């Protein structure tokens, strides 16, 4: 294989990369979002400087993605903190748990998404929208919401989903010392909101050493949204280099 072909390959193995080159288009990407108030000191412990915790709010999300170009069919669940960076409001991606290896690999290698393996689900149980996250055989999170009780303004839904997202990109040298340690910013711009609803919601978190979502306890559910979209993820860009 020629050197230029090695450079152009999106990933390894070279003869069958773990994921294809993006961008990736998501059709019928479905969200269950529950925003809740948590303990401010606990939240500050997981949000890195120079980000600032604006309010002690966390968004728990479960995303069902049945049709993603290049990556197929998968589901994600995770937590995002409401933050500010140099006065700009946004969210910080704390953790994302995914049931699809190409989505994990591409998210970590191309972007800075804090992805690891998990077992999330999003489904309708009679009159209830249910989002769950398990790690192995053990429960980590259970979210419930009344199914399509009230229409949600589509512009409000779009605004929530297109907030800037900040993430931490870390990559070591072969000796274990830091090689890349950056704060990056990404934002969804190409999005069509096909439907949006709200309703009563509850969220229960279970303590787990390797999926510590419960370290950010649910003190009060602030809002809930069920949103159906088509979208393309934006590219990440570096906003702060910790090694500079």
UniProtKB/Swiss-Prot annotation:
EC number(s) recorded for this UniProt protein: 4.1.1.4
Enzyme class: lyase
Active-site annotation: 115
Top-level taxonomic group: Bacteria
GO molecular function: acetoacetate decarboxylase activity
Xref: Pfam families: ADC
Keywords per UniProt: Decarboxylase, Lyase, Schiff base
Catalysed reaction, written as an equation: acetoacetate + H(+) = acetone + CO2
InterPro entries: Acetoacetate_decarboxylase, Acetoacetate_decarboxylase_bac, ADC_dom_sf
Family, per entry: Belongs to the ADC family.
Cited function: Catalyzes the conversion of acetoacetate to acetone and carbon dioxide.
Name used for this protein in its record: Acetoacetate decarboxylase
Record lineage: Bacteria, Bacillati, Actinomycetota, Actinomycetes, Kitasatosporales
């Amino acid at each position: 294989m020629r050197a230029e072909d090695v450079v152009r390959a999106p990933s390894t193995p070279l003869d069958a990369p773990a994921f294809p080159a993006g961008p990736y288009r998501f059709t019928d990407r479905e969200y269950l979002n529950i925003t809740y108030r948590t303990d401010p000191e606990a939240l500050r412990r997981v949000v890195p400087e120079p980000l600032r915790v604006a309010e002690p709010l966390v968004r728990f999300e479960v995303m069902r993605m049945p049709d993603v170009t290049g990556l197929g069919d998968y589901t994600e669940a995770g937590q995002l903190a409401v933050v500010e960076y140099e006065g700009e409001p946004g969210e910080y991606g704390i953790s994302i748990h995914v049931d699809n290896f190409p989505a994990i690999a591409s998210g970590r290698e191309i972007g800075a998404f804090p992805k690891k393996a998990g077992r999330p689900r999003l489904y309708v149980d009679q009159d209830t929208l249910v989002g769950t996250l398990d790690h192995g055989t053990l429960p980590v999170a259970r979210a419930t919401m009344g199914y399509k009780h009230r229409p949600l303004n589509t512009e409000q839904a779009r605004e929530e989903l297109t907030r800037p997202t900040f993430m931490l990109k870390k990559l070591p040298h072969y000796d274990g010392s830091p090689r890349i340690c950056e704060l990056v910013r990404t934002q969804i711009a190409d999005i069509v909101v096909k439907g949006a609803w709200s309703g009563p919601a509850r969220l229960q978190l279970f303590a787990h050493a390797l999926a510590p979502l419960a370290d950010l306890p649910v003190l009060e559910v602030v809002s809930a949204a069920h949103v159906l979209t088509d979208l393309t993820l934006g590219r990440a860009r570096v906003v702060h280099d910790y090694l500079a």
